[in-house]
Amino acid sequence: MLFPTEFDVIVVGGGHAGTEAALASARMGAKTLLLTHNIETLGQMSCNPSIGGIGKGHLVKEVDALGGAMAAATDESGIQFRILNSSKGPAVRATRAQADRILYKAAIRHRLENQPNLWLFQQAVDDLMVEGDRVVGAVTQIGIRFRARAVVLTAGTFLDGKIHVGLNNYTGGRAGDPAAVSLSSRLKELKLPQGRLKTGTPPRIDGRTIDFSKLDEQPGDLDPIPVFSFLGRAEQHPQQLPCWVTHTNERTHDIIRGGLDRSPMYTGVIEGVGPRYCPSIEDKIHRFASKESHQIFLEPEGLTTHEFYPNGISTSLPFDVQLELVHSMRGLENAHILRPGYAIEYDYFDPRALKASLETKAINGLFFAGQINGTTGYEEAAAQGLLAGLNAGRYVQEKDAWCPRRDQAYLGVLVDDLVTRGVAEPYRMFTSRAEYRLSLREDNADMRLTEIGRELGLVDDARWDAFSRKRDAVSRETERLKSTWVTPKTLPAEEATALLGKAIEHEYSLAELLRRPGVSYDGVCGLKGGECGPAEPLADDPVLLEQIKEQVEIGIKYQGYIERQASEIERNDANENTRLPDGIDYREVRGLSFEVSQKLNEFRPETIGQASRISGVTPAAISLLMVHLKRRGLGRRNGKAAEAAEQGGGAVPTQQ
C-alpha cells in the first residue's frame, strides 16, 4: 500500500497537548503523524474560551519561548487581553486573553497543516502495538496499523469518558464526541496505575437574551494592549470585546440546594474527584455556605456568534435546575440556554509512573501528556505536550531526554510536582507552586528558555534573531546604566527632586537611581533633558523596545533578590542533579525506615532532588541516601547537565 504507515513519532489526540506535541516533534525533524478522531476539532477549546491567567500565563509564555503555537494563536484570535495582578510585583503578573473559538482553532490548524515533517490523519485509535516493554505503533478504529518508535498519548477526557447531566449519564469524550472506550481498556491491560477524575462545564447562553443594561462591564486593557507571544503584535488582534459581570444571590443558592438530591456529585453517581480551583457551582454553595453571592463572568465565545460562556457556574445539575438558577441572576432573567452544562468523568494515569521526560517507566517509547496525567487546563496540557513531543523526537534520535528544572521554568515545576507527588485531584498551575517565582516571571521566559530551545531544535531563525537582538540590547543597556554616573553638579537639584523627591548628595550611577521606589527606566533616561538615555535607540520595533526596557528595569530593581535566589539555587544544585541508579534497592540503604524505602522503591525517583519531594521522605532519609551513594560510589552528577549549566542552559537530561 502506498499510503504511509511508518513514522518516527505518532501523536494520539488533537487537543492542546496533542497539537503542541506534534508540532514540537516535527520541528525536531522527526517524521510525525497526528491521529485525531475529527480533524475539525483540532485545537478545540472544549470549555472556557480563554487562555492564560495566574500561573497559566507563565506556562503559555514558556511554550512560546520554546517555539510553541499557543501564544501566537491567541494573539491572532484574542478578543480581549488583560494583565492580571498588574499592581503587584512582576513575579505574579499574568496575561489572560478571551479568544474567539473559531479563530483559535483556525490558527492552530493552519500551523499544523503547514508544519514540515507532520502528517494529519482522521481516525480514532483503539489499540496500541506493544512488543515486550516497548511501544511500536497504534491501531485505528478501522484497523489501520501505524508503526512508530515513539507514541505520545494525549487523550484528554476521552478515556472511558462519561457525561453527567442530573442523574442521566452517557458515554462521551465531551459533548458531541465519542469516548475512547477501547483504548481505555487496552491501557488498563498494560497494568499502568490509573484512577478516575471529573471536570465540568457551564451551560452556554444566547447573548441576544441577556439584558446587558443590568450588568457591570469589564473591558480589556487598552493602554498598552497586551500581547501573548514574544513575537506578537497588537495589530494581529481581531476586534476587541468586553466581558460582563453578574452575581448569584440567595435565591440562586436556594435553587441549587433544592436540586442537590438530583445532583450526580451529591448522590454518589460521580466517583471521580473534581478540580479544587475550578469547582462546580454546587460545590461552591456547599463549601462556602456563608457566602451570600458569587461573581459570574459572562464571556463572549467569539465575533461570529451570540454565544456566551458564564464563567463560574459549571454544573451537572438537571437541566430544569440549570434553567432556573440561570434565570435567578440579574440580567439573565430571560436568558435562553443554548447548551446544557455537564460534568464528565474520565480515566487518568498516575503520573508518578512517568519519567521527567513524560515517558512511561514501564513501556519504552510511550509518552503521556495533558489530562491523562491528572492535570486540568489548556495551558498545562500545551506545556506537557510540547515537552512530550520534544522528548519523543529525541527518543527516536537516540538523544538524552530534556526537562527543565524547578528553578528554570514553571514547566519544570509542573512536571516535577506530577512525577514526584502525583495527584489526588486535577492539578492546576499557580505562581504559589514555584519556590523560585521571582526568577520565573512571564517577562523573562524567553531569556530562560529560548537559547535552550534553539539548541534542542525547537526555535526557528525568526524567533532566534528577535531573541538575540533583545538579549544583547538588555545586556548592553544594563551595563550602560551601571557605568553612567551623575553628581550633584551635573544633575540639577530641581530635576533630581522631580524624580527622586530630593536633590542627590553625592555621585550615583543611573542603575542606583533606578533601584529607588517609584523610579522608572523612562524617568532615569529622561534626566538632563534626555542626555541620560541611550545614544541610539535600543530597538526599531516598538514591541521589542518595550520588552527590553521592562527586562532592564526589573533586572536592576530586583537585582539583590534575584542574586539571593540564584545563590539558593546553586546550593541546591548538587541534590537536584545527583542521579539515582536505575537498579538500586532502597531496602539495602542502612537506616532508612520501611515506609521510606517502600515509597522510594515504588516511585523510583530519578534524582536526589525528586526523592526529597516525595511525601514522607525526610531530610534525614536524604542524608542517609547520600551517604549510601557515596559509600558505594553510585551517585553521579549528570555530565551533560553540568555542561549545559556552564553554558547557561541549565538543561537536565533525563535517562531514557
Swiss-Prot record:
The keyword DNA-binding does not apply. The keyword NAD applies. InterPro entries: FAD/NAD-bd_sf, GIDA_C_N, MnmG, MnmG-rel, MnmG-rel_CS, MnmG_C, MnmG_C_subdom, MnmG_C_subdom_sf. Its main location: cytoplasm. Coiled coil: none annotated. NAD(+) binds at residues 274-288. Pfam families: GIDA (PF01134), GIDA_C_1st (PF21680), SAM_GIDA_C (PF13932). FAD binds at residues 13-18. GO terms for biological process: tRNA methylation; tRNA wobble uridine modification. It is found in: Cytoplasm. GO terms for cellular component: cytosol. It comes from the Bacteria. NCBIfam families: mnmG_gidA (TIGR00136). This is tRNA uridine 5-carboxymethylaminomethyl modification enzyme MnmG. The gene is mnmG.
